Amino acid sequence: MSSSPVVSRDILEELQLYTAQNLEKLEVNKYYEVIRELGKGTYGKVDLVIHKIRGSKMALKFLKKKSTKLKSFLREYSISLYLSPCPFIINMFGIAFETDEYYVFAQEYAPSGDLFDIIPPQVGLPEPVAKRCVHQVAIALEYLHSKKLVHRDIKPENILIFDKECRKVKLSDFGMTRRAGSPVKRVSGTIPYTAPELCDTSKHDGFCVDYSTDVWAFGVLLFCMLTGNFPWEKAMPSDTFYEEFVRWQKRRTGAVPSQWRRFTDESLRMFRKLLALEQERRCSVKEVFAHLGHRWMLDGTSGNHHQSVLNSSSEEDELLVDRMKQQTLSPTANTSNAIEPGSANHFTSMSTNSSVSSTNSYERSARDSPPTSRILVTTPIEICV
């Protein structure tokens, strides 16, 4: 196990180097038919396209050269490709190129959008649907963590769905992903998913990336899915709802916080572990597997519990590099050598959160069949129910 971080480091660096050496400048319209824009933002856009040679739908992610360093583009693309063997992580087509204005890569298209679209505000998803989604996201995070990587931007906008019942979901957007233990600069601003240790403005020197921040965000995500609300606006003493939760976590009061009273004792035990105030005391995301067979909501029903096993090996890593080297990054590549996702008709979307915590903040364009769900609101009045 001690050699795993070194293996991951070498492979990611090799993928980045290979991509940089083979990055071609192309005209998008020559190889793709643009169907529509899926989203746009400060850093770029995402288009739904049809590959003129393969005839397959895919999503092209465009990152503006003016605001994106080549190093950042290469890192996001390489990490995405490196993680794509996991069936619960968005798949890649092995296509990366540049235009005069953008760095571009292609990934699969999910027709049902993202998780944010289907969570009814102040209601939440039915418990069986939420459990299906949570189970798959937990597997994806366990896989990512087994590769010594931390996502750092877990939220509904970054979980793509392939049907409204969440029978198939995938984790996406690895622009913020870094190796565990890497030093990073402190980011100004917070979102409800930000762990308390990252909200501490008294620490100005930055911090080291840690798995526990993903665990915290995962716990908040679970709350949002089940309730349609955020538990707080920010994990800071100035937030009344967070402080109420802190008193309960520290067992200074026996009363369950008002917005947590809808949960069963079993699920509250799960939340205590996922949202431990001290990061070293947080459990891993796989802790949720032990609770899938129990009821989570006082007025809900239990979903089905299916055990899943993660198999991660260095052989799998080497196979990915070999596949990468056997093809060109160009969209003109022979289709027989291309890396194809496991299924067609997928969608990728970017984060809609305007927080500077994400390097990829996008506004989603209207779809042909817009979802009926409203936007999750984050004002204090809406949070406390």
Swiss-Prot record:
Coiled coil: none annotated. Its main location: cytoplasm. Its EC number is 2.7.11.1. PROSITE patterns: PROTEIN_KINASE_DOM, PROTEIN_KINASE_ST. Pfam families: Pkinase. Residues 32-297 form the Protein kinase domain. Changing residue 61 to R: Loss of activity. It catalyses: L-seryl-[protein] + ATP = O-phospho-L-seryl-[protein] + ADP + H(+); L-threonyl-[protein] + ATP = O-phospho-L-threonyl-[protein] + ADP + H(+). Belongs to the protein kinase superfamily. Ser/Thr protein kinase family. This is Serine/threonine-protein kinase SBK1. It comes from Danio rerio. The lineage of its organism: Eukaryota, Metazoa, Chordata, Craniata, Vertebrata.
